[in-house]
């Protein structure tokens, strides 16, 4: 690791998770009898990051496309997460979480189910210079899309064209899309489809050995009383397998377990917004410097995560 800044070396899918509500217990399990636990204050939230092995997708200058993915249990299984190079998971209202998957240079026939925008996800779309895809939006997200002049693709206006409905899931958990459809929509709107912006993280196929890291063969993140996510390290395949609500998460298209190579957790506060609709929508205090963890190959190290503005990319610093 480079001093002052982590070389976040991505080989598999990146997931960024923000857990909400209650006391957050983040566990690094060495073995069945030894557990190290880091406990946050109430409403302290982690962001987790994972990555994908298709390094060829970073050889070009294709602009990323971000897609909001439904994570309600009625939406399971989801499609496209394993094809994304980065996925953010953040708390939303009702104790649920939502995912934002990023695609670059990928050809994915089915992505979804697609759900509505939340304003703090826009921060991470901006730092990745991504076209932002959603199906509807909260009032705060609608305001920010206009305020920041976000290049977005909204399923409300493109249902039946860019998006289609599947019969094996009930609305609102049944809208899907594809990278081909999204690119066609972006081109029709005359959005730029290339980008020269530097990636948020550095990518390599080399293995990362966290020699001085603490054991992390099992990582548990209770976002709320409703949603607990767990990653279990498979020593044979050298990836983390994803579980949610004690269920192994499967890919909708392949039926295989959803996996990741690298995880980044950032701890920051979330809170309930006060608005006229009173739906319990969340806000996120994600601007500043926060504690975090980088996790890969069954080990974890502490890091600092710095985000100076909503538009600027997050910087991850090694503590060494």
Residues of each region from the PLM?
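Hydrophobic single-pass membrane-insertion segments
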Residues: 22-37
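Residue-level detector of intrinsically disordered, flexible termini
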Residues: 18-19, 24, 185
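N-terminal Sec-pathway targeting helices
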Residues: 2-17, 27-29
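A surface/extracellular/periplasmic glyco- and lipid-processing/surface-interacting theme
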Residues: 5-7, 36-84, 93-320
